[in-house]
Amino acid sequence: MDEYVIDARGIRKSFPAGDAAPEEALRGIDMTAPAGQLTALIGPDGAGKTTFLRILCGLMKPTAGTVSVLGTDVTKTPQQVQERLSYMPQKFGLYEDLTVRENMDLYADLHGIPREARPARYEKLLHMTGLSPFTERLAGKLSGGMKQKLGLACTLVRTPDLLILDEPTVGVDPLSRKELWEILLAMKQEEHLSVLVTTPYMDEAALCDRVYLLNHGRFLFRGTPEQLRETAQGFCYGTKPPENVPTRMVQSRLLTDPAVIDAVPSGGMVRFITRVPDGALPGLSELRLSPQPMESRLEDGFMMLLKEDAEKEKGDVPLYGTDKVDISSFDDPSSHDTVITVRHLVKKFGDFTAVDDTNFTVHRGEIFGLLGPNGAGKTTTFKMLCGLLPATGGELSVAGVDLRTARTQARAHIGYVAQKFSLYSAMTVFENLRFFGGIYGLSGKRLRERIAEVMEEFDLTEKQHEPAGTLPGGFKQRLSMAAALIHQPKILFLDEPTSGIDPIARRRFWQQITALAAAGTTIIITTHFMEEAEYCDRMMIQDQGRLLILGRPSDIRKEMGRPDADMNEIFISIVEKGRSSPSSGA
């Protein structure tokens, strides 16, 4: 058993569910994690990943099964195990009113690290995380990426025998994700650190030695990243849409075909998975598109197993609906009216300039992406566009209304979905919709009609009497969308709408967004999933308050000299180039 830092056998965990049968979160799973390796635990939202991590850390007892961590039965002597492992939960407990160094001191005190051992350890961690220049900065003043790095540094103030991380990069931009993983890989190499990490990012799982795929409390896969990738080999294809047709339109059409396991925009193409020989789908020939074989990726194996499991449970029912998008009727939004105009926009907080002389326009029916690293100024820009924050200078109009003088009037034309889905947990789905409809001025027959319409549109009718707080993540997202659209706004603002949502729910979400845009709704979106930049008609990338680049994804790739690269690579290149230029002040 000593060769494994984790040896779990037959783990079950059930939670009471009132008068109903107990809810089974884990259904008899086995896991072994060898010492000195990086092990990834992946799976959709609600799969049971966090429950399993808490059991391994001795924070929760299993209903059944045995758990040996670092050679010790964690169910009998949890404290003995906890003295040798470090755990970084999703919401790590930084003290925002303490400085970077004070947070590290606090965790060093908690772990009993001798004072004479701290300087060398601190120096190494601060250097690796890039936090050396910020030791006296309050944690609350750090960007999201820097907070995650500080959380990791605090977790590693002692040298643990096992490091357990629960989605350490959710809500973190691609550049910060890359830096965090460089730290993990370096620590594994230098200190022979054993790591178990959960992640929604398949490119991160690909960096690990072993991968476990959990769904509905059961493991669908155990093995190496390469073995998971190979499960989809020979079933992956790509097709390139005509110049004037967005990849999202072709993707949405493909997803309605029961023979398509998955489809996603990537590098200006649409990648898809199908068991149909040579990828020769009738829908492609109708669109005069040709498939070409492609190498599988780890995400392809992930989606293939997840889709097959879902269809076993739900039967032969298309997961993405059957409503076909009419690609022939696509109307390029660049020819439509301008609904958002931004000229020389500036926002200052005291002496700090969060947004500096930014200019852009957005057209009716356009999907426009606001992208950037944590702390880039995109959230500030987003809030000014929504009328939630006044600008310091410049011109800003939304739906023909000047936001400098009539913010309340402009908000009547806007729908807004916040990062954390601003729902009332104790109220039912129906009650939430009635409440938000009332806020937007709907009443009587019109309110009842709109509630019925959005419940049908977002498949919420069967859930209408359930409290919002008990809904799975994907349903909460749908309810937030329904609430934001109940008054039929001209413009929909989406702030990190797919964070923490499983891949199948993400695909459904983008089908709905594609349909909304085709019907004339303008979409403004922020996201850290760079694949989602491919859905945008145009996008802008900000950093340090400055606009670095603006244009169509395909044009931006060409401008960077990499027409076939994925947007993750392009994003990192643009930000690194911007920070190295003399005008960046870096």
What are these regions (language model features)?
Residues 57, 386:
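Helix-to-loop junction immediately C-terminal to a conserved catalytic motif
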Residues 163-166, 492-495:
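Catalytic Walker B motif of ABC-type/P-loop ATPase nucleotide-binding domains
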Residues 138-142, 467-471:
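Conserved ABC ATPase signature
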Residues 105, 109, 116-134, 434, ...:
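Conserved ABC ATPase "signature" region
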Residues 65-73, 80-81, 394-402, 409-410:
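Conserved ABC transporter NBD signature motif
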